[in-house]
Amino acid sequence: NVISGKDKALQKRIIEEGKDSKADLYITADAGRLGAFQAKGMFQRGASSKAIKAAVPSNFRTAYWTGIAKRARIIYYSPERVSASELKGMTYESLADPKWKGKVVIRKSNNVYNQSLVASLIKNNGKKATAEWAKGVVANMARDSKGNDRAQILAVAAGEADLAVANTYYLALMLSGKKGPEQQAAAKKVKPFFPNQDGRGTHMN
């Protein structure tokens, strides 16, 4: 049997059912969510079989959970207002550069996708540098944070911003036409850019 639902609702159900829970597998998006749920003691060790170790790189699994898919959190840009040469060597850290003042959009900081990105920045750059980076990004924002990842892409397409941070699959979803012709047309007005290619690489989750 498969029970689908919102992440928080499913976690609440598993916690309330406790030892009586019939759930064998819990599938959700983002390692941050998995880590938080693991910290509550809700997983059993067992995600370390030979088959899993052979199929999944060590950085995408623990003894308690394993990744089964991955996506990148990248930068989208307007090719009409930003040239490819301007993005050469672009990093997540570059989003705090004053040259992008009034040109960046990203969803709210309470979003788990952003929290995981920030966690990776803390891991690589330290808490102090990451805190300064966050202040720089806020100073560069074209508007107050609002909406989901697709809303950020739409903002770039509409000319409200030049750069947006969003996961890769949202662009594919928009281009497919499943979200309507307006979003499909908007998606064609932006281009994806994978940052940090000269260093640690793009953030994957």
Question: How does the language model describe each region?
Answer:
Residues F43-K50, R61-I68, Y77-P79, A84-S85, E93, P98-N125, P181-G201, ...:
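Short beta-strand->loop
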Residues E17-Y26, M42, W100-G102, A158-A166:
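Alpha-to-beta junction loops
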Residues A31-M42, F60-L87, A119, T202-N205:
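Periplasmic solute-binding protein
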Residues S21-Y26, Q44-Y77, E93, K103-I106:
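A structural signal for short loop-to-beta-strand junctions that line the ligand-binding cleft
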Residues K6-D7, I27-G32, S49-K50, N148-D149, ...:
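Beta->alpha turn/N-cap motifs
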Residues S109, Y113-S116, S120-P195:
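Ligand-binding pocket segment of bilobal, Venus flytrap-like solute-binding proteins
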Residues N1-G35:
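Early extracytoplasmic/lumenal segment of secretory-pathway proteins
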